[in-house]
């Protein structure tokens, strides 16, 4: 059975009140219409500038497990550097503030993800490839 797609602000607010977060943790189980997702992301994070990025990184660090998604080590002193975009902000600014477009990574694996030569060897690569296909499909 296909998941119910959240199309309205009321449905989004209802999910939040019930303890779900279709913007982040529950995004794949409770998908949102892309126009609504963009609108809410803009409201929460603002523009794709330094202030907006700071809000976005803080949100991700508050809503995602603070464990490297590649090696499983705990992120003891979380910072914006631990929030690694799957699709780069520069090449895909429309996805820069989509929490589905990030991994939480330790510094070593953040650097590895950014290098095409080491990216293919990473455990998160197959999952990220599926995410890339889904995000590109939704944002086109």
Where are the model-predicted features located?
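Histidine-centered nuclease catalytic patch
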Residues: 72-102
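Charged phosphate-binding loop/patch that engages nucleotide di/tri-phosphates or the phosphate backbone
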Residues: 120-140
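Single-residue recognition of alpha-helix capping/boundary positions
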Residues: 11, 109, 128-131
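Short Fe-S-cluster ligation motifs
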Residues: 97-113, 133-140
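The −1 position to Zn-ligating cysteines in a subset of zinc-ribbon hairpins
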Residues: 67, 82, 105
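Short, charged surface segments at domain edges that flank catalytic/cofactor-binding sites
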Residues: 2-12, 16, 22-70, 94-96
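Short Cys/His-centered divalent metal-binding micro-motifs
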Residues: 73-76, 102-124
């Amino acid at each position: 059975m296909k998941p119910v797609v959240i199309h309205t602000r009321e449905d989004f607010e209802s999910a939040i009140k019930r303890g779900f977060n279709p913007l982040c943790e529950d995004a794949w189980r409770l998908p949102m219409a892309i126009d609504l997702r963009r609108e809410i992301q803009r409201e929460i994070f603002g523009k794709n500038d330094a202030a907006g990025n700071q809000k976005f990184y803080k949100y991700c660090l508050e809503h995602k497990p603070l464990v490297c998604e590649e090696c499983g080590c705990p992120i003891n002193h979380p910072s914006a550097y631990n929030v690694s975009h799957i699709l780069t902000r520069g090449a895909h600014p429309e996805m820069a503030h989509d929490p589905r477009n990030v991994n939480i990574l330790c510094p070593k694996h953040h650097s590895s993800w950014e290098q095409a030569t080491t990216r293919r060897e990473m455990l998160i690569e197959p999952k990220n490839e599926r995410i890339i296909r889904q995000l590109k499909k939704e944002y086109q």
